[in-house]
Amino acid sequence: MKSTLIILRGNSASGKTTIAKELQEHFGQGTLLVSQDVVRRDMLKVHDTIGNLSHDLLFEITKYGKGKCEFVILEGILSSRRYGDMLKELIHFFDENTFTY
């Protein structure tokens, strides 16, 4: 299965999560939604600092969707300083089959 990665980035309260959930609903069953806030705040209870535990988990969960899900949506503030290299790796991992916003 060919997987498409959709990355939604932006400021706090800009509508990323709302749009991501709407996209997941639109694409339907098997669409993986990876939310930075859920992983960082709810699952790990860590602050968004350089090197925090959520970085690696976001990366691994997102990679998990390749070949298993038609669409993988990664959403969050995902600042370039903290997550830029990870995002570039994911884009490469998904064979450039990526949309970024």
Per-range role (PLM):
Residues 31-33, 96-101:
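Conserved beta-strand scaffold positions in the cores of enzyme catalytic domains, especially
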Residues 11-12:
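The conserved Walker
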Residues 5:
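Walker A (P-loop) ATP-phosphate-binding motif of ABC ATPase nucleotide-binding domains
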Residues 8:
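Hydrophobic anchor at the beta1->P-loop junction of P-loop NTPases
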Residues 15:
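Conserved glycine(s) of the Walker
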Residues 1-2:
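Basic/polar N-terminal segments that are highly enriched at the extreme N-terminus
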Residues 18-70:
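Conserved substrate/cofactor phosphate-moiety recognition/catalytic segment
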Residues 50-97:
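Glycine-rich phosphate-binding loop used to anchor ATP phosphates in small-molecule kinases
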